[in-house]
Amino acid sequence: MREVNSNTVIKEVEQIVEKACSRDTNVFGYNIWTHHITQVVKIGKKIAGRFNADPEIVEIAALLHDYAGIKDHSLHKEHHMHGAIEGGKILKDLNYPEQKIEAVKHCIRNHRGSVPGKRGTPEAECLASADAIAHIEYVPSLFYLAYAKFDMNIDDGTDWIRKKLNRTYKKINPELRYLIDEKYKSAINLVAKKEAQL
C-alpha cells in the first residue's frame, strides 16, 4: 500500500464534509460548516497540545464528528455511531492507515455530551471539549438551530438551548473550563428562566 499524505487526506475530508453541508438535504444549513465544524477544527487544533493529542487525528475527527447527521438527518439521534461508520468508510477509501482510522472513529463515537461514553484517549477528550467550547463560543448558532431550523417557539427554544449549554459545559475537560467560564455564564444568564425585572 502506498504512503498516504495526511494533508491530502485532510483536504479530501474537508471537501467531502463541506459539500455535504452545502446540500439542500442538510437540515442544519450551510451554517453548520461556517459556524460549527470549522470552529471545532480550529479549537481542536489549538487545544491538542494541552492533551498531548495527535493534532491530525483531532482535525480529521473534528471535520467528521457531525457528518452523519448532516448527510442524513434521520441519523442525527445516533450521529456519533453512524458518523464513526461513515468516517471510517471515507478514510478507508482515502487509504488512511487503519490504526488512525480507529482512533478517529473512537473520537467521533465519544464526542457527545448527551450520550455517556468513554473518551479514553487524548484525541477523544480534545474533540469532545472542542465541540463543547464551539457551542458556547458561538451561541447564536444554537439560537439559529432552535428558531430558524427547528421552528421552536420561544419557551421551547430557550429551554432547549439552556439544556444544550448545560450538557455542553459538563463535557468540557475540567482543566479547560476556565477558558470559557465567563462566556458560559453569560449565555446561561441569557436563557435563564426569570421574570422581567423592570
Model-derived segments and spans:
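Divalent metal-dependent phosphate-bond-processing catalytic cores, especially two-metal-ion Mg2+/Mn2+ enzymes
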Residues: R2-T8, N26-N52, L64, V115-L198
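Short coil-to-beta-strand
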Residues: T8-V13, A53-A61
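An active-site-proximal "capping" alpha-helix that borders the catalytic cofactor pocket
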Residues: V40, E78-D93
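Short alpha-helical hairpin
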Residues: E3-R23
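His-Asp-centered metal-binding catalytic motifs of divalent-metal-dependent phosphohydrolases/nucleases
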Residues: P55-S74, H79-G83, A103-G113, D131
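Short amphipathic alpha-helical interaction patches enriched in hydrophobic/aromatic residues
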Residues: C21-T25, A48, Y67-D72, L91, ...
